[in-house]
Amino acid sequence: MDSKERIDQLTDQLKEAGYRYYVLDDPTMEDYEYDRLYRELEELESAHPELARADSPTKRVGGEVLSQFEKVSHSVPLMSLQDVFSMEELNDFLEKTIAAEGNAEFSVEPKIDGLSVALEYVDGKFVRGATRGDGTVGEDVTENLKTIRSIPMTLTGAPSRLIVRGEVFMPKKSFEKLNLRQEELGKPLFANPRNAAAGSLRQLDPKIAAKRGLDIYVFNVQLADGVEFTGHTQSLE
């Protein structure tokens, strides 16, 4: 097996293992085996950089430290969600919606408390990710988003241009681990997982963001070229 074949084999193996671990929560490879194959891939790519694939797992971490985040205009505005604080408010919303729409159907989903972002794919490749900002203009945090293992770098069978919206969050275990490390270093503790997630995603050094254990929950299709949906539920499917 030549170097190119081995690089392709390792890339595919590690991508599949990462997908099963981070997305399906069904690991099929021991951590030590993953680390061993990852190091082998790093060494081969270092010796043959021209053979490294754009979707290689090693491309997730290692971007240069930024001096600042570039501003990004959202192709489709990321609207804010309206809160309700009582059953009366909820019933009022339901009554108004049914009166306006008739036999309305509702999609009920958990609300993840994190930082809203837009992920853009062109020809199946992840090209850019940005924070919500004011809904119209956000910040380019592509390099930090690449470190989140549950975000695929490539998609099969995707529209030529696809933009989805998700919520970046920090799982409780990652939050507890981060605060323990902060305490050991004599640094201030984070008040809650949401603050920790927001601060981690806005690190100018992607290597720091990569150590924070961030995750994402994608909940909306903002744009899908050539695809029409009859409703929100269908877009989720």
Question: Model segments located where?
Answer:
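RNA/tRNA-interacting regions in translation and RNA-turnover enzymes
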Residues: 1-237
